[in-house]
Amino acid sequence: MRKWCLMSKQLNGQEKSELVHNVFQNVSTKYDRLNDIISFNQHKSWRKYTMKQMNVKKGSKALDVCCGTGDWTIQMAQAVGKNGHVIGLDFSENMLSVAQGKTNHIQNIELIHGNAMELPFEDNIFDYTTIGFGLRNLPDYKKGLEEMYRVLKPGGMIVVLETSHPTMPVFKQGYKLYFKYVMPLFGKVFAKSMKEYSWLQQSAFEFPDKYTLALLMAETGFTHIKFKGFTGGVSAMHLAYKPKEK
């Protein structure tokens, strides 16, 4: 999973982009280890469930936006098979470098340095677009969704896996305490990067809940939207489609 005291809502788009870029440039080599620790390894089971719901077809073409160190990219490559193709895109060169080390031996993966707000692809070319714990880092959530909508083929699927907001009182209180006190401490102890990982606390609190995100996806044009919260609602999967052409 992906500041300091200044809230990002006070930053313009360029300032937020630069801040987030610096965060991931600095934590790239420690990102995977700390993710396992701060999520208690739950992020793997969330993604496993999500992949089952996607039921990816062999031979498909997929785009993993904000691919980070490449874990979901690799799973998508396995799912589409040798006749499929998966592109992982990220704006952090250092995160891509880690991903490259994991994917050098995988023939159907291509990694690209690029901007999720201006995807370097033509319209209507991907069967699937995915974004895992990256949407909240974009300066404009709706613009990011619009770009993924644009590059999807009609009938194509988008899947968003992201932090969310627990609704049960026990989980809600625990969530606030964990992100405010425990998670930044993990960052300091295990990654020597409390400053960078405090961004996770902030971006998670500011990101819409699962119901609001579903509405935002509908406003973008996606249909047949379904979502599911995980682990008391601390994260959520959203799955939707670009309408088929009439």
UniProtKB/Swiss-Prot annotation:
Q: What is its EC number?
A: 2.1.1.163
Q: Which Pfam families match?
A: Ubie_methyltran
Q: What InterPro entries would the database entry show?
A: SAM-dependent_MTases_sf, UbiE/COQ5_MeTrFase, UbiE/COQ5_MeTrFase_CS
Q: Give the catalytic activity.
A: a 2-demethylmenaquinol + S-adenosyl-L-methionine = a menaquinol + S-adenosyl-L-homocysteine + H(+)
Choose any GO biological process term that the UniProt entry carries and state it. Answer: methylation
The protein's annotated pathway: Quinol/quinone metabolism; menaquinone biosynthesis; menaquinol from 1,4-dihydroxy-2-naphthoate: step 2/2
Q: Which GO terms describe its molecular function?
A: demethylmenaquinone methyltransferase activity
Q: What keywords would UniProt list here?
A: Menaquinone biosynthesis, Methyltransferase, S-adenosyl-L-methionine, Transferase
Q: What class of enzyme is it?
A: transferase
What is the similarity comment for this entry?
Belongs to the class I-like SAM-binding methyltransferase superfamily. MenG/UbiE family.
- Role of this protein: Methyltransferase required for the conversion of demethylmenaquinol (DMKH2) to menaquinol (MKH2).
Name of the protein described by the UniProt record: Demethylmenaquinone methyltransferase
Q: Which organism is it from?
A: Micrococcus luteus
Tell me what gene encodes this.
menG
